[in-house]
Amino acid sequence: MLKFIGRHRPSFLAVLLVANLTVLVLPVVGTYVLYRLYEGTHLVRSTEGDLIAQGAILSAAYTTSFSRILASESDRRAYGVPVNEKWRQVRDPETEPFRPIKPRLNKLRDDVYLPAPNSTTGYEPDPIAIQVGRDIQPALIEAKVVTLTGIRIVDFNGTVVATSGTQLGESIANREDVQQALEGRYTSLLRQRVTDSTPTQLGQLGRRGRVRVFVNLPIILDDRVLGVVVLSRTPPKGFEAIKELPR
């Protein structure tokens, strides 16, 4: 047995070669793991955070326009649908003035859903929501040029009343995440991105990853859901984001 081991003992050169290869491979593997974590967690959550910020501003703009159009306080209190008891937040504005929403998506952990189902037709938007939508529609279109964010604002029935693109007057209430948001719950998820064989220049800039981040922010006033801001954007690829880091 000892003779067999002696005859098959690796040479010093072979041991040195294996050790050097290990030293070379470990940094590569470590760098790859860090890259995957950066792309799958940081960039996705950064995108979600940006969408939350945009959605909060649009939600505030919507409620401001809504309060101006529907001036009667009693009418406002009867408008929309009540927030589901499960999602109602009991807080004292004096002791808890802020209500932050933290990004939570993780491409390495969360499911990636199929592209959003097609919108449906045949639904009549709420008349008040139509007026509010007309007020803020130009802002949505201008924002998309800079942020590359797809934006839809739906009324309390899930019908699109303002959009940065298409589907105006159509319903997206067939999406489960939108249904939950219409109950007053913030929802976010990852979907497979839809590719286009003949994308525009803007589309080429926007479709740089394998997934698209979707955020659904309820528009709530006096514990009643007026509608939902639906936003989506493709996070940048890791290498592109790294190139933009300050040197």
Identify the residue ranges that each predicted region occupies.
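A short, hydrophobic, proline-anchored segment that marks a local hinge/packing element in signaling
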Residues: R193, L205, F214-D223
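Juxtamembrane membrane-water interface segments immediately C-terminal to a transmembrane helix
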Residues: L34-A60, I69, I130, L245
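Extreme N-terminal signal-anchor transmembrane helix of membrane signaling/transducer proteins, especially
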Residues: H8-R36
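Short, Lys/Arg-rich, polar N-terminal cytosolic tail immediately upstream
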Residues: M1-H8
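Helix-start (N-cap) segments at beta->loop->alpha junctions
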Residues: T195-D196, I220-D222, V230-P246
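Extracytoplasmic/periplasmic sensor domains and loops in membrane signaling proteins
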Residues: D111-I141, V145, T159, T163-R210
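Short N-terminal helix-loop-first-beta-strand/juxtamembrane motif that initiates sensory/input modules
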Residues: I57, T64-S65, A71-A116, Q131, ...
